[in-house]
């Protein structure tokens, strides 16, 4: 049964602080916790806040482990738009997390299925994800789990929809440079996280956000599977939350 805690914020900085509070609580309780991390512009205020908190002595990442949601297929780790490089530049290079304790899917792996299985084993060996950061696509995708006729369970390769490629072309010189495939955690891997924190901004996300949490659960809206998670905190700005229940309201469905 979904237990949804809604926190509404006015600015990206407020969102970063609210999300950092969730991560800080987990890290302080379990110093060797496993974070599930995401990329994109929305998590940046969170990452800046986490860096600031460690610099202020409030957090210690030296024992923390992290597993990223996804990576583009075909991009080297040092490619300007690879998610490995994004994480290095925006978080890992600025905190005390050990390089061997950060994993991102290998978009250049010769054997993608074997790499995906190894990725799952690593997360399992670590004891599973304690806190998973998520966003949501305009079509309801989480990670790169695109709308389809089933819920992919484990980490896997996926062909990206034109909607997703169009949404991500702002990070590239042209749509032709946007990869056509990616590697992503499956919804089963995401759902296995003990806690999920979702960060959402923009009026253009209001409809899909409501559909994810209050529409029918179906693989055509991959994020709707979150209705079966027992601990979800949604942090969103007021326009994204236009159709959602009131701030601070805890919804059980």
Feature names for model-found ranges:
Residues 48-60, 83-85, 147-157, 217:
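A glycine- and small-aliphatic-rich helix-loop capping segment at beta-alpha/alpha-beta transitions
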Residues 33, 42-46, 122-149:
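A glycine-rich beta-strand to alpha-helix segment
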Residues 143-187:
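Class I SAM-dependent methyltransferase SAM-binding "motif I" and its flanking Rossmann-like core
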Residues 188, 192-253:
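ATP/nucleoside-binding phosphotransfer catalytic cores, i.e., glycine-rich phosphate-binding loops
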Residues 36-40, 68, 105-106, 133-136, ...:
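Short beta-strand segments
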Residues 1-35:
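N-terminal glycine-/serine-/threonine-rich phosphate-binding loop
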Residues 29-55:
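Glycine-rich N-terminal segment of FAD-binding domains in flavoprotein oxidoreductases
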Residues 1-3, 59-132:
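Ligand-binding beta-strand-loop-alpha-helix segment within the catalytic cores
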């Amino acid at each position: 049964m979904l237990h949804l805690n809604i926190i509404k914020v006015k600015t990206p900085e407020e969102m970063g602080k609210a999300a950092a509070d969730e991560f800080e609580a987990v890290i302080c309780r379990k110093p060797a916790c496993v974070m599930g991390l995401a990329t994109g512009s929305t998590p940046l205020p969170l990452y800046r806040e986490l860096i600031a908190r460690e610099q202020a002595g409030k957090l210690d990442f030296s024992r923390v482990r992290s597993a990223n949601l996804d990576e583009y297929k075909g991009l080297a780790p040092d490619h300007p738009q690879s998610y490995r490089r994004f994480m290095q530049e925006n978080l890992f290079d600025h905190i005390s997390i050990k390089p061997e304790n950060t994993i991102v899917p290998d978009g250049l792996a010769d054997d993608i299925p074997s790499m995906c299985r190894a990725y799952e084993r690593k997360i399992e060996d670590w004891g599973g994800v304690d806190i998973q950061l998520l966003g949501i696509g305009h079509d309801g995708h989480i990670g790169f789990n695109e709308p389809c006729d089933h819920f992919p369970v484990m980490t896997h390769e996926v062909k990206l929809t034109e909607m997703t490629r169009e949404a991500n072309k702002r990070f590239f010189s042209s749509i032709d440079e946007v990869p056509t495939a990616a590697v992503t955690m499956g919804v089963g891997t995401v759902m296995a996280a003990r806690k999920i924190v979702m960060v959402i901004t923009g009026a253009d996300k209001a409809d899909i956000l409501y559909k994810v949490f209050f529409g029918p659960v179906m693989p055509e809206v991959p994020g709707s599977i979150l209705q079966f998670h027992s601990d979800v905190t949604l942090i969103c700005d007021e326009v994204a939350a236009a159709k959602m229940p009131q701030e601070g309201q805890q919804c059980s469905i």
